[in-house]
C-alpha cells in the first residue's frame, strides 16, 4: 500500500498541530526550519530529545536554507538513532527523506516522509496511548491517512511480521489497532472497539427515532399546510418536503444497512476476539510451561555444573587441608622453638638490663668520682697556694725582724753619738751663760761655740754628716734592689711550687685512671660483657671525629650556599637572617663543644690504650673464661638471628597461601556468576512482537542519549 505523500503531508500537519508547540506548524514552509519538529520530538521523549539538544536546534533562527538543511540533518540523525537504539526499529533507506529539498524548497513529499518518521516515534514511545487517543479525535479522513501511513511504515519495516499466516485476514480497522498496540493489550482494544460500535448503534437508533418523529411531524404540518395555504405555495413546499423525505429515507436506509454491517462485523470481531483470547491463553500457558521447563533445565544444568565445581573444589580443599595440617604441625614446632628462643631472649634481656643498670650505676659513680677529684684538685691547689703564701709571709716576717734588730742597733749607735755631741755642747754653754748680758743675741753665741770647737772635731762632724747622707742613699738603693730580688725569688718559688703541685696531681690522676681501668676490666669480666679491642675503640673514636668533621664541612657548605642565595631583604628578613645566624653560631658552638668533648675522649682513650699496652701489663690479662663467654654470646646472637629469619619466612609463606586461597575463591565465584549470566541472557528477538516487548520494557538511564549511545546496537 502506498500513500500519496502530498496528502500525507497535509494530514500529518493536521496531526502535528495537536501538540500545541510554540513555533508555527500550519504549512510546509513553517516546518522547513525544523524548530516545530524539534519541539514535538522534545514532547515525545524528553530524555532522548533533551533540552540541550533542543537548544542546539534553536540557537540560530537565520532564514538561510543551508542552516535549515543542517538542522534538519541533525533532527533526522537523532530520529534514526532513536528508532534504532530505543525503539528497536531500524529505518530503511526508502523512508529517509531528502532534507535538502525540505530546507530549500519545502517539498511536501519529502516533508511527509520526515513527519511519517516522527509519527512512528510517537506511536512507539512510552506515551503512545495518549498519542493514539489524539489521533482518534481527528477527522475520519485524517485518521484514515494517518493509519495508512502507520501501516506502510510498519509493513516496510517488518514485512514478515504482517503475513496472513501470523495474524489472519483482519480488516483495515482491526489491523490498524493491531499495529498501534501490543499483543498483550490486543483483546482489550478489540473489546473497547466493540463497545464503541455498540454506542454508535445506540446513537444511530436514537437518531433514527428522532428522524421518524420529525418525519411524522413534517407530514402533519404538510397536511395542515395543504388545507390552509394556497395551492402554488403548497406544491412547492410539498416538493421540498418530499425531496427532504427521500433524502431522509435514503439516509435511514444507509444507516440501517451500515448498522447491519456493523452488527455483523461486531459479531465477527467478537468471534475473532474469543478465538484470539483462547489462542492467547493457550499460548500463554504453553509459554509459561516452556519457561518453567527452561528455568528448571537451567537450574539443573547450573546445579550439575556447580556440583562438579564443588567436587573439584572439595578435592583441592582436601589436598590443601592435608598441606595445612602439615603446615600447622610445622608452625606448632616453630612456635615451640620460638617460645624457647623467646624465653632465652627474655633471660638474656634481663641479664642485659641488669648489666645496663650496673653500667649506669658505674657511670654515675665514675662521674661522682670525677667530680670529687675535680673538687679535690681545686682544694689541693688552694692549699698549695695558701701554703706558699704562708711561707712567703714567714720569710717576710724574718726579714722584718732582722731589719728591726738592725734599726735597733743603729738607734743605739745614734743615741751614743748624740750623747757625745750633747756633752761636747755642754762645755761652751757655761761660758755663753756667763757672758749673756754682754751679747744677748743667740747668733753670736753659736758663732762663738763654733769658733771655740776644735778644727778636727769640726771636720770629723762634717765628714760624719756626709758619710751619713751617703750611707742613707746607699741603703735606699740596696733596699730597692733587695726588694726586686725578693720579688723575683717569690715568683720563682711560686712557679716551682705550682709545677710541683701539678706534677703531683698528674701522677695522682694517672694512678686513679689506672685503677679505674682495672676496675672496669674486673666489672666487665664479672658481668660477662664484651670488652672491645683498643684498636677498635680507637677506630670508633676516629669514625666519630670523621663524622663530626664531615658535619662541620656540610654546615660550612650550607652556610656558603645560603650566603650566595641571600637576596636584598627588608628589616623583617634581616631580623630573620640574624636569628638564623645566631642559631648557626649556637650550632657551631655546640659542634665545637662536641669536638672538644671528643678530643677529651680521645685523650682518655689514649691513656687507656697506653695502660693496656703489653709493655705496662702482662699479656695474659684476658682470661680463657672471658673468651668462652664472648664465644657463647656470639653463638647465642647467631641462633637468635637464625630463629628470627625462620619465623619471618614462615609468616610470609602463610600470608602468601592465604592470598592464593582468597584469589582462587574469588575467581571461581566470578566465573560462576559470569556463566550464570550468559545462561540466563534472553534470546535474540527475531519477531516484531519480541522487538515491541524489548522496546517497551527497556529502561533508559537518566542521561538519555548520552547513556544509550554506549549500549550495543541490536542486530536485526
From Swiss-Prot:
<keyword id="KW-0597">Phosphoprotein</keyword>
<feature type="coiled-coil region">
    <location>
        <begin position="188"/>
        <end position="427"/>
    </location>
</feature>
<feature type="region of interest" description="Sufficient for interaction with microtubules">
    <location>
        <begin position="1"/>
        <end position="546"/>
    </location>
</feature>
<feature type="region of interest" description="Required for localization to the centrosome and induction of aggresome formation">
    <location>
        <begin position="1"/>
        <end position="161"/>
    </location>
</feature>
<dbReference type="GO" id="GO:0005802">
    <property type="term" value="C:trans-Golgi network"/>
</dbReference>
<dbReference type="GO" id="GO:0070695">
    <property type="term" value="C:FHF complex"/>
</dbReference>
<dbReference type="Pfam" id="PF05622">
    <property type="entry name" value="HOOK"/>
</dbReference>
<comment type="function">
    <text>Component of the FTS/Hook/FHIP complex (FHF complex). The FHF complex may function to promote vesicle trafficking and/or fusion via the homotypic vesicular protein sorting complex (the HOPS complex). Contributes to the establishment and maintenance of centrosome function. May function in the positioning or formation of aggresomes, which are pericentriolar accumulations of misfolded proteins, proteasomes and chaperones. FHF complex promotes the distribution of AP-4 complex to the perinuclear area of the cell.</text>
</comment>
<feature type="region of interest" description="Required for localization to the centrosome and induction of aggresome formation">
    <location>
        <begin position="533"/>
        <end position="716"/>
    </location>
</feature>
<dbReference type="GO" id="GO:0007040">
    <property type="term" value="P:lysosome organization"/>
</dbReference>
<dbReference type="GO" id="GO:1905719">
    <property type="term" value="P:protein localization to perinuclear region of cytoplasm"/>
</dbReference>
<keyword id="KW-0333">Golgi apparatus</keyword>
<keyword id="KW-0653">Protein transport</keyword>
<dbReference type="GO" id="GO:0008333">
    <property type="term" value="P:endosome to lysosome transport"/>
</dbReference>
<feature type="region of interest" description="Sufficient for interaction with CNTRL">
    <location>
        <begin position="582"/>
        <end position="716"/>
    </location>
</feature>
<dbReference type="GO" id="GO:0005813">
    <property type="term" value="C:centrosome"/>
</dbReference>
<protein>
    <recommendedName>
        <fullName>Protein Hook homolog 2</fullName>
    </recommendedName>
</protein>
<dbReference type="InterPro" id="IPR001715">
    <property type="entry name" value="CH_dom"/>
</dbReference>
<dbReference type="GO" id="GO:0005874">
    <property type="term" value="C:microtubule"/>
</dbReference>
<dbReference type="GO" id="GO:0008017">
    <property type="term" value="F:microtubule binding"/>
</dbReference>
<keyword id="KW-0175">Coiled coil</keyword>
<dbReference type="GO" id="GO:0030705">
    <property type="term" value="P:cytoskeleton-dependent intracellular transport"/>
</dbReference>
<dbReference type="GO" id="GO:0005829">
    <property type="term" value="C:cytosol"/>
</dbReference>
<keyword id="KW-0493">Microtubule</keyword>
<feature type="modified residue" description="Phosphoserine">
    <location>
        <position position="163"/>
    </location>
</feature>
<comment type="subunit">
    <text>Self-associates. Component of the FTS/Hook/FHIP complex (FHF complex), composed of AKTIP/FTS, FHIP1B, and one or more members of the Hook family of proteins HOOK1, HOOK2, and HOOK3. May interact directly with AKTIP/FTS, HOOK1 and HOOK3. Associates with several subunits of the homotypic vesicular sorting complex (the HOPS complex) including VPS16 and VPS41; these interactions may be indirect. Interacts with CNTRL. Interacts with microtubules. Interacts with ZC3H14. Interacts with LRGUK (via guanylate kinase-like domain). Interacts with CCDC181.</text>
</comment>
<dbReference type="GO" id="GO:0031122">
    <property type="term" value="P:cytoplasmic microtubule organization"/>
</dbReference>
<dbReference type="GO" id="GO:0042802">
    <property type="term" value="F:identical protein binding"/>
</dbReference>
<feature type="domain" description="Calponin-homology (CH)">
    <location>
        <begin position="6"/>
        <end position="122"/>
    </location>
</feature>
<dbReference type="InterPro" id="IPR043936">
    <property type="entry name" value="HOOK_N"/>
</dbReference>
<keyword id="KW-0813">Transport</keyword>
<dbReference type="Pfam" id="PF19047">
    <property type="entry name" value="HOOK_N"/>
</dbReference>
<feature type="coiled-coil region">
    <location>
        <begin position="455"/>
        <end position="605"/>
    </location>
</feature>
<dbReference type="GO" id="GO:0045022">
    <property type="term" value="P:early endosome to late endosome transport"/>
</dbReference>
<dbReference type="InterPro" id="IPR036872">
    <property type="entry name" value="CH_dom_sf"/>
</dbReference>
<dbReference type="InterPro" id="IPR008636">
    <property type="entry name" value="Hook_C"/>
</dbReference>
<keyword id="KW-0206">Cytoskeleton</keyword>
<comment type="similarity">
    <text>Belongs to the hook family.</text>
</comment>
<dbReference type="GO" id="GO:0015031">
    <property type="term" value="P:protein transport"/>
</dbReference>
<dbReference type="GO" id="GO:0030897">
    <property type="term" value="C:HOPS complex"/>
</dbReference>
<keyword id="KW-0963">Cytoplasm</keyword>
<dbReference type="GO" id="GO:0007032">
    <property type="term" value="P:endosome organization"/>
</dbReference>
